[in-house]
């Protein structure tokens, strides 16, 4: 059972290995959303995510014999690092089963913390089944990433820190994958202030908790599809589900393109890298149907590999019309490339890539295709560039951008 005494005990124990991440007031998000928005930056933890809280507290409750057997868990990344780090602190051996789709940065960091990594399955649920199989075969002690009350208690210490710093908080937004963080935060928040609203946020393509609440029982999704790999869970925790039903006020879902926009917002306005799962609560702020409230958005982690980061930035710029590609037809004769460049420069467009195709038509005397990838200030500027090209008789057509 989750009790205030246990949360207070966990806070003391967890403080041995975690940072008390201070709330960051966001002028940008507050103005954008019409509420007073505070960010709880768990991406600044030593392991890059909040997961170390639950892992360390859970391992602290084990007997010396259980720790000596060796520990095992399954994780999409952040819980893996939490368990690896906590196990190292307790001098225990850790084996981590991770989906084959786990970003390389999370795999390498887990190995660097001394854990043995086994890559198996496409999603968390498949990795978890493998971890249970290995636990039975070798006698390891299993540390569940979310469906464990001790783990949820450790995660809930975030709420203790939020209330300590912002006693009059009115709303807390918390990401949901399997539900451990949401269980701990919502339960402790309601114990400290029964009137507070705690809103869970899930990816639209992995909304297992929303489906479970709607059905009144733990529900398994047939598939999950989201860029938020850390919350790509098919089945939420059954042990913690009653706490979610009791203490969570609502669930908001967000699309992948909303996460991409949130990533750009955080990088450009807060100079902060937050992974896609950690951005769920930022993306959901626009869907919160209240104004003038004190809202805390929990940023659950920041472990993102550079390749994924690059892809998200590129897609974000394309979504916001700050990068686009246009196809124009030019007479195949000297000077035409310079002329189209002058047209673009005349409206402050910035060319970042050119592709010249002489074989777009069988009549080379008629025209050649030029694909121009441009940088713009946004939609209005993009339209201004297109208008200039139209007036220059270039017959511009928007085509797919490929950088």
Go through the PLM ranges and name each one:
Residues 1-403:
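PLP-dependent amino-acid enzyme catalytic core
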């Amino acid at each position: 059972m989750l009790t205030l005494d246990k949360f207070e005990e966990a806070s003391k124990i967890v403080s041995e290995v975690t940072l008390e991440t201070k709330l960051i007031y966001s002028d940008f998000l507050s103005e954008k959303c019409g509420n007073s928005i505070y960010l709880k930056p768990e991406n600044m933890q030593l392991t890059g995510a909040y997961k170390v809280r639950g892992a360390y507290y859970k391992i602290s409750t084990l007997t010396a014999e259980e720790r000596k057997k060796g520990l095992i868990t399954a994780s999409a990344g952040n819980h893996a690092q939490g368990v690896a780090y906590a196990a190292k602190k307790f001098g225990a051996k850790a084996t981590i089963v991770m989906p084959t789709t786990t970003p390389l940065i999370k795999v390498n960091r887990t190995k660097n913390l001394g854990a043995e990594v086994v890559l198996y399955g496409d999603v968390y649920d498949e990795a978890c089944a493998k971890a249970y199989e290995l636990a039975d075969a070798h006698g390891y002690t299993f540390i569940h990433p979310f469906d464990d009350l001790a783990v949820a208690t450790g995660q809930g210490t975030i709420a203790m820190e939020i209330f300590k710093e912002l006693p009059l908080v009115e709303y807390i937004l918390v990401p949901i994958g399997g539900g451990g963080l949401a269980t701990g935060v919502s339960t402790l928040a309601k114990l400290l202030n029964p009137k507070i609203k705690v809103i869970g946020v899930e990816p639209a393509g992995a909304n297992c908790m929303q489906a479970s609440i709607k059905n009144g029982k733990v529900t398994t999704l047939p598939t999950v599809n989201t860029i938020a790999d850390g919350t790509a869970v098919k089945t939420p925790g059954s042990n913690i589900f009653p706490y979610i039903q009791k203490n969570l006020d609502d669930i908001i879902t967000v699309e992948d393109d909303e996460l991409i926009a949130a990533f750009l917002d955080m990088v450009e306005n807060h100079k902060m890298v937050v992974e896609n799962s950690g951005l769920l609560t930022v993306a959901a702020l626009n869907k919160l149907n209240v104004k003038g409230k004190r809202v805390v958005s929990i940023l659950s982690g920041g472990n993102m590999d550079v390749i994924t980061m690059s892809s998200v930035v590129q897609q974000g710029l394309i979504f916001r019309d700050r990068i686009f590609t246009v196809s124009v037809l030019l007479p195949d004769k000297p000077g035409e490339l310079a002329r189209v460049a002058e047209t673009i420069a005349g409206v402050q467009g910035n060319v970042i890539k050119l592709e010249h195709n002489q074989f777009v038509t069988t009549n080379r005397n008629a025209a050649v295709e030029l694909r121009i990838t441009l940088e713009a200030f946004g939609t209005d500027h993009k339209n201004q560039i297109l208008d200039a090209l139209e007036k220059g008789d270039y017959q511009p057509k928007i085509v797919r951008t490929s950088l």
